Amino acid sequence: MASDFLPVHRALLSVSDKTGLVELARALLAYNIELLSTGGTATIIREAGLPVQDVADLTGFPEMMDGRVKTLHPMVHGGLLGRAGIDDAVMAKHGIAPIDLLILNLYPFEQITAKKDCTLADAVDTIDIGGPAMLRSAAKNFARVAVATSPDQYPDLLAELQAHHGQLSAEKRFALAVAAFNHVAQYDAAISNYLSSVSDMHTTLPLRHEFPAQLNNTFVKMTELRYGENPHQTGAFYRDVHPQPGTLATFQQLQGKTLSYNNLVDADAAWECVRQFEAPACVIVKHANPCGVAVGKACSDAYEEAYATDPTSAFGGIIAVNRMLDVATMQSILDRQFVEVLIAPDYDADALAYATKKANVRVLRIPSTGVMNRYDFKRIGSGLLVQSTDSLNIHSDALKVVTQLAPTDAQQRDLLFAWHVAKYVKSNAIVYAKDNRTIGIGAGQMSRVYSARIAGIKAADAHLAVTGSVMASDAFFPFRDSIDAAAAAGIKAVIQPGGSMRDNEVIAAADEHGIAMVFTGIRHFRH
């Protein structure tokens, strides 16, 4: 099969994306390839002074119904589906000439339906019928026919034609066929998702369910991983076909070893946490939990404070900052500790040069523009849980003071900082903080009071004074015991959602200890 090169004598071009069309047509003609085309595609080729035959002349049947019917004809599909050495006689009998190359992309359904003023009629008009049919015909017959669905594929296609004197290999035809079927599957999934979400088709703009009756998501494999979460598991990394800008999946790896499954899980936790801060910030993550977070005048300051929270856990961690990482900060990190992954929006040249001293460190660049993904997905046995992303933040004017003592301005800033961090800590989550840095973090405990105790232990191990610090809890306190433990540690202000049956007991405990407490009315469970 490796030597199965076939010449291209005839090509059909029908594209909605006209990028590179004229250049492609001119290049194909240089190999004496006959061009067929439809509608606007043929017009552009002809206006460029290039010879092209209209499909309507081939079929003997005009385009009709505003272009809805133009290629659904045996002269077209027979030319694409005809098998060399098998269908030659029947093709000759009916005057069907082979089509060796199909260049086609589909009506822009996703772009049209993404517009706020898109009506149901607009969406339906953008559903391509003839295009997917031709793509499937050409891709099914990859033994003889090649098919390209995107301008991104033109350079490689032309390079192979040039390298092999107007011929394409079986491997190239097969790879293009797979891409074509993937393209059609993605297109049909987009149509299904849109129509399944329509709850009222009679309004001017269709009312749509947040969660469609059927969900079809498309992912593209970026790389296979050495193994999964553990060495006995296999693993791979897939990305949304349309990744949200600024999310982890858009990373560029600048150096270092191949990323592991656990690297990616931890990197996502670190990046999502750090990019919520407006001021320069640093987040250090271990096992998907922040073990140190700080905000400073510069990322160098933030790193120093974040590291000091828990130097033991920071070893072998993932470090993310939300500003360009300079050489001084790079040197401070790499000279002090072992790090698995570094993440930043960018790096100065000297920082990257210094990073090469530790060639195994994985250095990722992620443009910081963009918003959070709208939805989170979690697999369960034979099922998928879908929820809107926990993107709700709170500001000082929304805090409800529930104790006799109100927090000071400085405490209020620390409370909001700790609250932002708690959202990214596994439940039950307790965060001790002071002066825009974490003092101790208690994560993932089945009992909230134990998370509070662990936060205190972490602070003591790092020789950090808890006295005067604030405490954040991702969910309400079911009993007063966590407040008693916090008071014993020296906590002076608490932020929590509220909503417990025993809120009054918890508030009374805070008043007894002279602790200021505010309610957010928002819970931040993380599992």
From Swiss-Prot:
InterPro entries: AICAR_Tfase_dup_dom_sf (IPR024051), Cytidine_deaminase-like (IPR016193), MGS-like_dom (IPR011607), MGS-like_dom_sf (IPR036914), PurH-like (IPR002695). Belongs to the PurH family. GO terms for cellular component: cytosol. Keywords: Hydrolase, Multifunctional enzyme, Purine biosynthesis, Transferase. It catalyses: (6R)-10-formyltetrahydrofolate + 5-amino-1-(5-phospho-beta-D-ribosyl)imidazole-4-carboxamide = 5-formamido-1-(5-phospho-D-ribosyl)imidazole-4-carboxamide + (6S)-5,6,7,8-tetrahydrofolate; IMP + H2O = 5-formamido-1-(5-phospho-D-ribosyl)imidazole-4-carboxamide. The keyword Transferase applies. GO terms for molecular function: IMP cyclohydrolase activity; phosphoribosylaminoimidazolecarboxamide formyltransferase activity. This is Bifunctional purine biosynthesis protein PurH. It comes from Xylella fastidiosa (strain 9a5c). Its EC number is 2.1.2.3, 3.5.4.10.
